[in-house]
Amino acid sequence: MGLTVEQPPTPTLVQGFQRSWQTLTDALVSLPGSQRRHYATLLLTRLIAVAALQQRGYLGGDEWYLHNQFGQSQQRELDGFFSQVLQPLCQQGFTLPAEERPPALRQRLGPLPFVPTGPFRFTELDQRWGHVPLPDAAFEPTLHWLADLAAAAPAGLDAGLGMLLEQAVNGYDGVAMATPAPLLGALCDRTIHATLLDRAEALTNHRYRSTEQLLKELSPAEAGTLLTELGQLTLLDPACGSGRFLVAALNQLMELALGLRAIATQNSAKTIPNWAKPSPNNPTLGLYQHLATHALYGLDLWPPAVELARLQLWLQGVQHTSQPTELTALPDLTLTVLQGNALVGLVRVDDERFDQVPPRRGAKDPEQAVPLQGNLLQPLIADSYQSVLGERQVRLEHYRSQTQLLAEVGSVPAYAQADFLRDRLDELDAIAQGKLTHLLWSEGSQQLGLRVPDPTGDRPTRPLNQTDVDATQPFHWGFYFHQQRRDQGGFDIVLSHFPRGAVEATQVGFVERYATLFEQKNVTPSTFRHNRQPVLTIDHDLTQAWAEYRGQFTWLSNYLRRSDQYPHSSLGPDGLSQNRLFWSRLFLERSLQLLRPGGRCGVLLDPFWAQSNSAPLRHWLQRQTDLATVLDLSNHQKLWPDIPSRTTLCALWLRHQGPTQGSPYAAFSKPNTALAPEALGGVLQRLIHPTG
């Protein structure tokens, strides 16, 4: 039950993962292009989760459970593994209490723990595509890869996945890079550790040089107070990708909590908050539960990345269990690791305008809705925005308390009640999302005058409609994180690796979106990527699809320029709008909107400081924040093996209170100044402790 120690992936493991992922995706050819990778990733996360449970000995002590079930299914019938093993395992096995499972299933699948949350949950993808037959061959590469992974990471699969999955997600539509461990450690130090030092300074009137010094000099009473404050911190990764940064943050917070608890215990257990008190049988599970539920939040636009991030945090929880029954205590990570567009959505909600929005056309009429303990939809139709926020908080707390009860009693009534309460929460969220997106559409179409290119219409452009806005998958920070903004002024910490490149249509995204059309035209993705212009010249339908796809980015770029959300990253030095917008600059500006005054931010992003077109952003940062470090790095000395030497990256950490004193900029980006992997850690330590 120790903290995860990462292992760099071997080339064999990297290739095995890619082969597994692609084989599952290719087997789902009957699905729409945009959903193939998502469902393949969901199935892959479930296979990894089963492998983690068998490695812990939770599946009847059979460490080869998956492989044995695969072999037995082939003896019964060919191509029956998906329909006869994996689907029943998830939908009638792990997610049902033992007494609810069909007897024939219990006999075939053996003793299984009850896992009410996590990768096995029933999803909309299962409802739509769970009936699609999949051949055994679709799973064979994954089973081979999982065997290799278990051999490489005998202490826990999570140790071998962090860098591998980060590399895979980053490489899907960009450069396949994984953050070097010293760099990730430095970002955690300058955010999580620095925030704890800020709290300690406020408590003791003394600035400690490091958390090591802090833990040596704290009194038990002070440690108990700081432990309470540590449990109140909130950390956001607004572009969480595979979840590696969230896992690193979890491990750092766990380590600090254990250190503070050990000191506080010397005085009296009374000084330790309830969430941090060790249980007799498990000293760390309670810490994990609290931090994963209340401290860590992630968001990503790409659904497969969200599935992988949830998986990685769930695997951490599995490592903190000591027996199968404790799996019921693992939190529902779908409440904290979310899917949506961090850059598009309302950060502040106008109460009066929300209250004036009528119900979405096509939504259920509340008078006709099936009553469940009264009319569940009525509060959103009749009540004010503030009432809706209050109702959401009540439903959220009811659901969390019910899942906690489920962890304690494990009964069928508790399990059914938890499902019911989650449905109530989802209903409320869905209707609020529709009304908030309507407000966003109204702003874009009426106030900003946005129009969408229309390659098939009589005119070059058409009015923006709400379907266009829905397609961007807006995330309304002001609604989903209202409590953090109201009570704390925002998140305490932002820790992230922002998306790279410019805001523009990509070939990878286009091929995935229109995969079915490519198959109808008998054009392979590689053919399009290497011969885009000739293909578009020849085929009218693909040309039209490409124009429609690009048009969605055109209006989105115009929104990002014209809205009042990004004045510093969308303007050039002459005060005019930038010709190109860059994802990472927009994310940086958004992050500071979400960070509380005095909060800390540590991120990786595209280099920008030395570029002339970044002057408005640079000057604003110097005025509004205390920029400690802006560090440009290049790959000329192979910080990231196997990717081009021209690859560059910027590491930045700051505190959200300005102004900046002195110059924070340092560059190791030219061939003659680039850092080798073994030199990176030393340079980072000198930046963190400049007088050391």
Segments from the language model and where they lie:
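Flexible phosphate/Mg2+-sensing switch loops adjacent to catalytic phosphate-binding sites
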Residues: E63-H67, R199-T228, E255-L291, G317-L335
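P-loop NTPase motor core
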Residues: G286-L299, A329-D355
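Conserved SAM-binding loop
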Residues: A309
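Class I S-adenosyl-L-methionine
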Residues: T629-A651
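Conserved beta strand-loop-helix elements of the APE1-like EEP
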Residues: T648-T660
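Short conserved micro-motifs at the rims of enzyme active sites and ligand-binding pockets
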Residues: V175, R348-D351, A505-Q507, D642, ...
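SAM-dependent methyltransferase catalytic-core segment centered on the flexible catalytic loop
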Residues: R244-P283, G345-Q402, A430, G444-L631, ...
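Preference for the N-terminal adenyl/adenosyl cofactor-binding alpha/beta module
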Residues: M1-M254, G298-A305, G340-L343, I431-N522, ...
